[in-house]
C-alpha cells in the first residue's frame, strides 16, 4: 500500500503532508473513501473526506469523514458506539480515492446492517473469463 500504515496501537508515523500532496481532491475539495474490514476484506461503506478529514484519519487512528449534507466532520461511532479503527490506508493509482482498512466495531451502516451494500442487490448479468487459450476478446 502506498500510504504509510498505522499500527493498531496508533504508533504509525505517516508523512501526512506528503500523502496530502499526492492526494487528488475533486473540485469540491472531497476525496471518496472506501471503507473495508481489514481481515475479511468486506467493503463496508463509502464516505467522503476533505484534506482535514484525511489528515485526522491518518493521525488519530479513527476514520473521520466530511458530511456533504451537514457540512461538518463526523466519525462513525461517536453516537452509536460502532467505531471504525484504522488498520491501514492507501491512495489508489490516480490518488483520487482512498482505501481505508478498519477494524469495525458493530455495524457500519446507519440502517443497522453490517455494510451499506446489503440492501439493494442489482442482479447484473454476470460475465465469464475467457478460457486461457482464447485470448482477449477484440
Swiss-Prot record:
Report the sequence similarity comment from the record. Answer: Belongs to the PRA-CH family.
User: What's the protein name?
Assistant: Phosphoribosyl-AMP cyclohydrolase
- Please give the catalytic activity noted in the UniProt record: 1-(5-phospho-beta-D-ribosyl)-5'-AMP + H2O = 1-(5-phospho-beta-D-ribosyl)-5-[(5-phospho-beta-D-ribosylamino)methylideneamino]imidazole-4-carboxamide
Query: What EC number(s) are associated with this protein in UniProt?
Result: 3.5.4.19
Whose protein is this, by species? Clavibacter sepedonicus (Clavibacter michiganensis subsp. sepedonicus)
Q: Per the database entry, which stretches of residues form a coiled coil? A: none
Gene that codes for this? Answer: hisI
- What pathway annotation does it carry? Amino-acid biosynthesis; L-histidine biosynthesis; L-histidine from 5-phospho-alpha-D-ribose 1-diphosphate: step 3/9
As for what it does, the entry says: Catalyzes the hydrolysis of the adenine ring of phosphoribosyl-AMP.
Biological process, per Gene Ontology: L-histidine biosynthetic process
Question: Please, which domain of life does this record's source organism belong to?
Answer: Bacteria
GO cellular component, alphabetical, reads: cytoplasm
Classification via InterPro entries: PRA-CH, PRib_AMP_CycHydrolase_dom, PRib_AMP_CycHydrolase_sf
The UniProt annotation places Mg(2+) binding at 92, 94, 96
GO terms (molecular function) for this protein are: magnesium ion binding; phosphoribosyl-AMP cyclohydrolase activity; zinc ion binding
Q: Does the keyword Isomerase apply?
A: no
Self-association state and partner proteins as the record states: Homodimer.
Ordered alphabetically, the record's keywords are: Amino-acid biosynthesis, Cytoplasm, Histidine biosynthesis, Hydrolase, Magnesium, Metal-binding, Zinc
Cite the NCBIfam families for this sequence: PRK00051.1 (NF000768)
Chain residues that bind Zn(2+): 93, 109, 116
User: How, per the record, is the cofactor bound?
Assistant: Binds 1 Mg(2+) ion per subunit. Binds 1 zinc ion per subunit.
Amino acid at each position: 500500500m502506498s500510504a504509510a500504515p498505522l499500527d493498531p496501537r496508533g504508533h504509525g508515523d505517516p508523512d501526512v503532508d506528503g500523502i496530502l500532496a499526492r492526494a487528488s481532491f475533486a473540485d469540491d475539495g472531497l476525496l471518496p473513501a472506501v471503507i473495508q474490514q481489514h481481515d475479511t476484506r468486506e467493503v463496508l461503506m463509502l464516505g467522503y473526506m476533505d484534506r482535514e478529514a484525511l489528515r485526522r484519519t491518518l493521525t488519530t487512528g479513527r476514520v473521520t469523514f466530511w458530511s456533504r449534507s451537514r457540512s461538518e466532520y463526523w466519525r462513525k461511532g461517536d453516537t452509536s458506539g460502532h467505531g471504525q479503527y484504522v488498520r491501514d490506508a492507501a491512495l489508489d493509482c490516480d490518488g483520487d480515492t482512498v482505501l481505508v482498512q478498519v477494524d469495525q466495531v458493530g455495524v457500519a451502516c446507519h440502517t443497522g446492517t453490517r455494510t451499506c451494500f446489503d440492501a439493494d442487490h442489482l442482479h447484473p448479468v454476470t460475465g465469464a473469463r475467457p478460457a486461457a487459450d482464447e485470448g482477449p476478446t477484440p
